[in-house]
Amino acid sequence: MDAPAYWGVAGRPVSHSITPKLFSIVGGAMGLVQAEQIFVEASGDEEFYSKVEMLEGDLWLSCTTPLKHSPHSKLGVKGPQGVNAINQLMRSKGVWKGASTDGTGFVSACRHIGVEPSGSILRIRGGGSTARSIAAAWSSEGGSIIPEKGRRELVRGPWD
């Protein structure tokens, strides 16, 4: 796997993010040549696109609020059904891809400690994009969701 020309974080605010440092640590452990770390301050698709279109080469970005909730239609990517958020964007050879990794990461961590989603019930508090991503991934692996009230209600989705 080749490292991108750039990796970092996009959204607003992003200056506090440790994501570029984490990319460097993981990239170094994988033997990837270090990419240039970037912070892309953007609140929506148009502002984001205007800032990254001038960058040459491949690009890996973690997206935070509010950018992760943008429709990303100009880039041709969309989040998983019900999640409606993308927290990872990648441009490789000029083609954009997006993913919501919170849920798959949570399921992987649960499996690592011996907890299988299939047939298990997960109580989940709130309804933000991380909660929706986890609910979608958990239910797609055969688990059930019991929503708990948080700052936001967990909307209806593929986990119902």
Language-model segment annotations:
Residues 148-160:
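Active-site rim beta-loop-alpha module in soluble metabolic enzymes
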Residues 23, 75, 138-141, 157:
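Short, aromatic/basic amphipathic alpha-helical patches
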Residues 45, 128, 155-156:
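Short secondary-structure boundary/hinge segments and terminal tails
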Residues 11, 98-103, 110-143, 147-149:
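Glycine-rich adenosine-cofactor-binding loop
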Residues 1-2, 149:
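Charged interaction patches that mediate protein-protein contacts
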Residues 5-7, 59, 120-122, 143-145, ...:
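Hydrophobic beta-strand segments of well-ordered beta-sheets in folded domains
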Residues 2-113:
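Phosphate/diphosphate ligand-binding glycine-rich loop within oxidoreductases
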